[in-house]
Amino acid sequence: MYQRLAFALVFLIIAGFVSFQVIFTVPEQPQIITQTGTNITQDIRCMEFKQPQVLDKDGELNVLVWNIYKQNRDNWQQALDAFSANKQLLLLQEASLTDEFKNWLVDGHWVSNQVSAFKALGSGAGVISIAQKEPIRACAYTSKEPWLRLPKSALYSKYQLSNGETLAVVNIHAINFTVGTEEYTSQLSVLEKVLKEHKGPILFAGDFNSWSEERLTAMKKALQKANLQEVTFSQDNRTQFITGLPLDHVFYRGLTLKNAKAPQSDASDHNPLLVSFTLNDQ
C-alpha cells in the first residue's frame, strides 16, 4: 500500500512538473516586447528609441493604473476603452499579449512596451506600459516568486515632457507569495536604486501586493528614499486584501497632483486607478 502511495505521489509530482513546463515558458533573462502599430520587436532587458516625442498634452498627464487580470473577464475591452479615454499613459499589470489585445493596441494607435516575464500557452504575460508616444528608453526587470518560481515584473521607462524635463516611470507587479519581506524589499530596492540616478520627475505605480503591515512599511520605506509621495484618492475603491489594506498604489515626485479616483469595475479582480497631473513650470 505504501509503495503504491509513494508511486502515486512521484507520478503526481512528475505530472505537475511536466504540466508546468508545457503551460509556462520562463526566459533566462528579462525580455521586453515593443509594439508600434502592427510592428512587434523583442530585445533582452532594454529598448532604446530614436524618435521619442512629448508624452503629456499641453502640460497635463492623465494616467490609468490597472491590474487587468490577464483579460479574463468578458467585458475587459469595453472597460479598457472607457478607462483609457483621454489618457496619455496606461500602466497595466497582469496583461496577456493575446492576439485580441494586440489588435486593441493597433486600433487605438498605442505604443506599448511589455516585460515578457513568462509565456502562458504561448502568450507573453507581465506588466505593460502603453502610451500614444514612444519613450526614450524602456528596461525590463523580473524577480522570481520564491515558491511558485514564476517571475513578477517591473518596467522602467523614460519619457520626454513638454517642459523640457524627462519623466521616469516604473510600472510594477510586486512579488506576492513570501514569508517575511526579504524578497519583496529586494525587488523594490533594485528599482529604487535605479531611480536615484534620475534627477527629474518620477511616477512609480502598480500592484504592490501590499497585503500586510510589514509589506506596507517596506514599500513606503523604499520609496521614501527616492523622495516620492503617495497619491491619495478622493474616491477610493482600491481593491483590498482581507486585512483591509489596498494592493494598488501610485507614488510621484516633481509633478502636481490634480485629481485621483479609484472607481469600481467588474472587468477585473482589481479596480482601476485614474490619476491626473500637471507639469511643474521650468
UniProtKB/Swiss-Prot annotation:
Q: Which InterPro entries match?
A: Endo/exonu/phosph_ase_sf (IPR036691), Endo/exonuclease/phosphatase (IPR005135), UPF0294 (IPR022958)
Show the Pfam families listed in the entry. Answer: Exo_endo_phos
Record keyword Phosphoprotein present: no
Cell compartment(s), UniProt? Cytoplasm
Question: Where does this protein chiefly localize?
Answer: cytoplasm
In the UniProt record, does the keyword Cytoplasm occur? yes
User: What is one GO cellular-component annotation here?
Assistant: cytoplasm
Q: Which domain of life is it from?
A: Bacteria
MF GO annotations: catalytic activity
Q: What family is it from?
A: Belongs to the UPF0294 family.
Q: What's the name of the protein?
A: UPF0294 protein VIBHAR_03217
- Source organism per UniProt: Vibrio campbellii (strain ATCC BAA-1116)
